[in-house]
Amino acid sequence: MAQFYSAKRRTTTRQIITVSVNDLDSFGQGVARHNGKTLFIPGLLPQENAEVTVTEDKKQYARAKVVRRLSDSPERETPRCPHFGVCGGCQQQHASVDLQQRSKSAALARLMKHDVSEVIADVPWGYRRRARLSLNYLPKTQQLQMGFRKAGSSDIVDVKQCPILAPQLEALLPKVRACLGSLQAMRHLGHVELVQATSGTLMILRHTAPLSSADREKLERFSHSEGLDLYLAPDSEILETVSGEMPWYDSNGLRLTFSPRDFIQVNAGVNQKMVARALEWLDVQPEDRVLDLFCGMGNFTLPLATQAASVVGVEGVPALVEKGQQNARLNGLQNVTFYHENLEEDVTKQPWAKNGFDKVLLDPARAGAAGVMQQIIKLEPIRIVYVSCNPATLARDSEALLKAGYTIARLAMLDMFPHTGHLESMVLFSRVK
């Protein structure tokens, strides 16, 4: 959810004030009131009292930091990660999972002006199947930093563990650090990505200078000893396969191959449940024609094709369209077609849209789908499922559908990223008869 602030800040006196927190926003900040103004205070939970100092004073709200906590909420928990509070990855490990879900659901309900029907969640720990770790060589100590960015900073937190990572990936952290820290090229490493696929574990190393034969041999030995598929990335365009074959993951009974750099949902458990619920909400029938917009490489498109008469997937990235077509062939799905289109243009005029669609699904990026809402309305589908990673743009885009006679039939909060401030959601719109 985007927040916008003006650059001008008011001078604060650093006076210590005592506040009582009555709410938690979707970013994990405690919310209190003082002198008629809303205060946002990181680290505090509802039912907690604390002494705080104001750090930023605006006309309608202020920000504060904790000086001393005077009481603890019954929903306060001890963070599992020793880096919590410094690392910018997680913001809510101090809150119970139930409180996190309630606060995010409440924020979503306020934006959408509709009750949240359900929370789609899975395991709250060990859920991330993909991580990108920054690398930085420290000349003074001749050591390699490996970790995530600090909150509000470009500095790196040198992580030793990360409990939200898939266990296989977390166990690799010290081994990867030791291997990379022994390379001659450790001054010229950008980042390393770790991915846990169904087919196995991937390591993608971004390096900014050519690797010596000794370094390449060391990396190959490491990949073989740990059973990793190894990829080298000398720049943003080139990806060299050193070991391993095309990776794949299981999704709703299908096997989907992907390139190591392709986007895949990081939370496999929630993704499976999300796809299953989307198909259920659309109530896909054997005679249905279904349109999937912003389809990527077919996360929803291919499962839809197992139930519908025909499915069209439309995507703006050519490489993902090609991957979707490849996965359709691999899974023996002949009733699905993928098209590369500019979704800012009127896709209803394309030949594949002339017979219309009964159901539509869309899963846009954070910018939302303002450019296609009128096109969807022209198609007059009976049901629409909108999957969103930004509730602000979801609320904006929903207005067009509501004005066109659609109603919100179901609203779900997707707990895709427990312990963080990320809020994802899914809505079912039905056309009023």
From Swiss-Prot:
Q: Which species does the entry assign this protein to?
A: Escherichia coli (strain K12)
Q: Which residues bind S-adenosyl-L-methionine?
A: 265, 294, 299, 315, 342, 363
Extract the ranges annotated as region (Interaction with RNA): 23-40, 58-63
Q: Which InterPro entries match?
A: 23S_rRNA_MeTrfase_RlmD, MeTrfase_TrmA_AS, MeTrfase_TrmA_CS, NA-bd_OB-fold, SAM-dependent_MTases_sf, TRAM_dom, U5_MeTrfase_fam
Sorted alphabetically, the Gene Ontology BP terms of this entry are: rRNA base methylation
Please name the taxonomic classification of the source. Answer: Bacteria, Pseudomonadati, Pseudomonadota, Gammaproteobacteria, Enterobacterales
| This protein's UniProt keywords | 4Fe-4S, Iron, Iron-sulfur, Metal-binding, Methyltransferase, rRNA processing, S-adenosyl-L-methionine, Transferase
Record keyword Nucleotide-binding present:
no
Family according to the record = Belongs to the class I-like SAM-binding methyltransferase superfamily. RNA M5U methyltransferase family. RlmD subfamily.
Catalyses:
uridine(1939) in 23S rRNA + S-adenosyl-L-methionine = 5-methyluridine(1939) in 23S rRNA + S-adenosyl-L-homocysteine + H(+)
What does the comment on domains in this protein's record state? Answer: Contains three structural domains: an N-terminal TRAM domain, a central domain containing an iron-sulfur cluster, and a C-terminal domain that displays the typical SAM-dependent methyltransferase fold.
Give the protein's biological function: Catalyzes the formation of 5-methyl-uridine at position 1939 (m5U1939) in 23S rRNA.
Give additional notes from the record. The function of the iron-sulfur cluster remains unclear. It may be involved in the correct folding of the protein or may have a role in RNA binding.
Keyword Acyltransferase assigned: no
SUPFAM superfamilies with a match to the protein in the record:
Nucleic acid-binding proteins (SSF50249), S-adenosyl-L-methionine-dependent methyltransferases (SSF53335)
Tell me which residues make up the TRAM domain.
10-68
Where along the chain is [4Fe-4S] cluster bound? 81, 87, 90, 162
What this protein is called in its record is: 23S rRNA (uracil(1939)-C(5))-methyltransferase RlmD
Q: Tell me the domain of life.
A: Bacteria
Q: EC number(s) on record?
A: 2.1.1.190
